């Protein structure tokens, strides 16, 4: 009898503990669901070190959206050269790319922060994400009157880059993700499974008219598997890996192989 009572007591404690864990898990999932927009469309914090690094060689530019919101941007290089437009990752200050790039001979490298990021006002959302990216492309086209020759994007920015594909431009997808849902589920794993993510911004094959123009650049080792996943999903795109070379050298090599 005592053994039976002890066993029942143990089972009861285990079930009670499991119940507590389940309540905690459900609470965390519920919290992530409530705050999904902040994870899907985060605001990039101003990166002071990167901005200090590009002081004196980057020119400030801006892009006015349809609703009057002004986006800050930067351009490095001779503005009469072909333009490389860069879409930063969701939580990346655009200045960080230019600080790492330093310079790109033969190109004017331009990039803008999204609404709500850096010094920009506004609230990022799914409703404005892609339309803002199109306006950014148009603003970059005004730098010298010609559409960007090269369009690059990192992480979720790669989704925006591929949606600007044109017949003659070169696309460089740096450590890309297939969708915002993938990015969130990769970050939180079992805490917030992909099927729960409501944000619906993704790369699809319908976005691609000429896969030969697209190169996936596997830049950071921790995102290597992710880059291969995108490569397999898109098919017939080129993949290149960066090891110790400067970022500018790798990008120039990609543009020369076009």
Residue spans for each PLM region:
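An N-terminal hydrophobic leader/cap segment in hydrolases
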Residues: 13-62
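Alpha/beta-hydrolase-fold catalytic nucleophile elbow
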Residues: 113, 152, 172-175
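Hydrolase active-site cap/lid region
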Residues: 158-210
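The feature captures the conserved acid-bearing segment of alpha/beta-hydrolase catalytic domains
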Residues: 181, 192-241
């Amino acid at each position: 009898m005592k053994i039976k009572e002890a066993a029942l007591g143990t089972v009861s404690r285990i079930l009670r503990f499991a119940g507590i864990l389940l309540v905690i898990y459900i609470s965390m999932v519920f919290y992530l669901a409530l705050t999904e927009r902040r994870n899907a469309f985060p605001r990039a914090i101003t990166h002071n070190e990167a901005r200090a690094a590009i002081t004196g060689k980057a020119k400030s530019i801006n892009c006015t959206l349809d609703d009057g919101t002004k986006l800050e941007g930067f351009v490095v290089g001779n503005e009469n050269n072909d333009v490389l437009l860069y879409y930063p990752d969701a939580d990346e200050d655009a200045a960080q790319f230019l600080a790492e790039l330093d310079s790109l001979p033969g190109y004017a490298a331009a990039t803008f922060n999204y609404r709500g990021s850096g010094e920009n006002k506004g609230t990022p959302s799914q409703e404005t994400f892609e339309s803002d990216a199109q306006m950014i492309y148009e603003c970059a086209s005004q730098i010298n009157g010609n559409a960007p020759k090269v369009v690059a994007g990192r992480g979720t920015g790669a989704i925006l880059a591929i949606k600007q594909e044109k017949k003659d431009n070169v696309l460089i997808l740096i450590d890309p993700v297939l969708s915002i849902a993938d990015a969130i589920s990769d970050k939180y794993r079992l805490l917030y499974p992909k099927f729960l993510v409501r944000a619906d911004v993704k790369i699809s094959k319908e976005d691609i008219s000429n896969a030969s123009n697209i190169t996936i650049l596997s830049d950071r080792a921790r995102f290597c598997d992710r880059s291969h996943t995108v490569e397999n999903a898109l098919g017939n795109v080129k993949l290149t890996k960066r090891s110790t070379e400067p970022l500018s050298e790798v990008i120039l090599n990609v543009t020369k192989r076009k």
